Amino acid sequence: MTDISVQSNTALESSETTHFGFTTVAKEEKVAKVAQVFHSVAAKYDIMNDLMSGGIHRLWKRFTIDCSGARPGQRVLDLGGGTGDLTAKFSRIVGEKGHVILADINNSMLNVGRDKLRDSGIVGNVHYVQANAEELPFPDDYFDIITISFCLRNVTDKDKALRSMFRVLKPGGRLLVLEFSKPVFDPLSKVYDAYSFHLLPKMGELVANDADSYRYLAESIRMHPDQETLKGMMQEAGFENTSYYNLTGGIVALHRGYKF
């Protein structure tokens, strides 16, 4: 199938500020900085995921698939899907009559994902779209399922992105947000902080020659809304029956909401 490449032409004109990790920056500056992070890490992204999580990210993603209720013939959006782990699984589930769109704002990540999936023989029911989560270029009521995995914390206007996802989701469809969150046990929080701020940047320097990007990763996780806050944001965007599961002691949470 022919690849689709879509980019928003809307200029970022706001002079408001936001956070890039622990640093306060202009909103348009965050967009550029986040883009640079993922241009830098794209080639080593999968290797670093396995190293950083000890491979547990595969179990988190499998749980996400299990909670998606995906069936043959459905239309799925893997938003911020990067190197395509979820897309690969959805492609097999929805089959020839289904359709999966792997969308990412970062063309370096999208290219890595496309090459990886094609090398694995995953073709035919997958399209690749470069798109901004805040301004999704799809019709209203279009997808049965939307997943956004380890991406939402990097989005500048999360509320706007959630409203955009709600718009393109079909009535009866579900959104699943897999993201780093807040550990529920204090001892785990202390160990996790030590790992994130000391070992993780060193690992990034050793494997990817990029300590700064992985320092941003740790900081972005701490700035991301906690479980209850994100649940409330989803409700404000229009999602109903919202709930979440804490995974690995809350280091990661899977949020789920429906459009009725």
Curated annotation (Swiss-Prot):
GO terms for molecular function: 2-methoxy-6-polyprenyl-1,4-benzoquinol methyltransferase activity; demethylmenaquinone methyltransferase activity. Pathway: Quinol/quinone metabolism; menaquinone biosynthesis; menaquinol from 1,4-dihydroxy-2-naphthoate: step 2/2; Cofactor biosynthesis; ubiquinone biosynthesis. Keywords: Menaquinone biosynthesis, Methyltransferase, S-adenosyl-L-methionine, Transferase, Ubiquinone biosynthesis. PROSITE patterns: SAM_MT_UBIE, UBIE_1, UBIE_2. CDD domains: AdoMet_MTases. Its EC number is 2.1.1.163, 2.1.1.201. Pfam families: Ubie_methyltran. It comes from Vibrio vulnificus (strain YJ016). It catalyses: a 2-demethylmenaquinol + S-adenosyl-L-methionine = a menaquinol + S-adenosyl-L-homocysteine + H(+); a 2-methoxy-6-(all-trans-polyprenyl)benzene-1,4-diol + S-adenosyl-L-methionine = a 5-methoxy-2-methyl-3-(all-trans-polyprenyl)benzene-1,4-diol + S-adenosyl-L-homocysteine + H(+). Methyltransferase required for the conversion of demethylmenaquinol (DMKH2) to menaquinol (MKH2) and the conversion of 2-polyprenyl-6-methoxy-1,4-benzoquinol (DDMQH2) to 2-polyprenyl-3-methyl-6-methoxy-1,4-benzoquinol (DMQH2). This is Ubiquinone/menaquinone biosynthesis C-methyltransferase UbiE. GO terms for biological process: aerobic respiration; menaquinone biosynthetic process; methylation. InterPro entries: SAM-dependent_MTases_sf (IPR029063), UbiE/COQ5_MeTrFase (IPR004033), UbiE/COQ5_MeTrFase_CS (IPR023576). S-adenosyl-L-methionine binds at T83, D104, N132, A133, S149. Belongs to the class I-like SAM-binding methyltransferase superfamily. MenG/UbiE family. NCBIfam families: MenG_MenH_UbiE, PRK00216.1-1, PRK00216.1-5. HAMAP family: MenG_UbiE_methyltr.
